[in-house]
Amino acid sequence: MARLLLVCLGGALGSGARYLTSAWALRAFGPDFPRGTLLVNVSGSFLLAGIMTASLQSEAVPPDLRLFLAAGVMGGFTTYSSFNYETLALVEQGRLAAAAAYLLATVVGCLVAAFAATLLVRWLAG
């Protein structure tokens, strides 16, 4: 039960952070492209890869903290369902180039971010 509570608390924090990040992106860039979701998914991929790499390479991140951060915070922060919905909305609006750019930027951006975080954590760990 305690581990479930850790995931739930982390999820609440991650969801709140996602809302704030998306709201900021909407104010900063406008509604023409889903930059907020792109930002949370790419940065979330970077952070999750960093958390997992650090926790699996050493005991510096205890299992309960890893659960709180990875499944909880990052699970609440990133959003695959919004990515899919926003891609479909762009297609339905006839904005095929924007949909393709969003799809490519998300998939490639998330993979590059995860790879970069993994390399960074391994480099920092020596």
From Swiss-Prot:
UniProt keyword Transmembrane helix present: yes
Q: Which reaction does it catalyse?
A: fluoride(in) = fluoride(out)
Which parts pass through the membrane? 4-24, 36-56, 67-85, 101-121
Please explain the role this protein plays, according to its UniProt record. Answer: Fluoride-specific ion channel. Important for reducing fluoride concentration in the cell, thus reducing its toxicity.
PANTHER family in the record: FLUORIDE EXPORT PROTEIN 1-RELATED
Q: Which family does it belong to?
A: Belongs to the fluoride channel Fluc/FEX (TC 1.A.43) family.
**Protein name, please?**
Fluoride-specific ion channel FluC
Per the UniProt record, the source organism is: Anaeromyxobacter sp. (strain K)
Please name the gene that encodes this protein. Answer: fluC
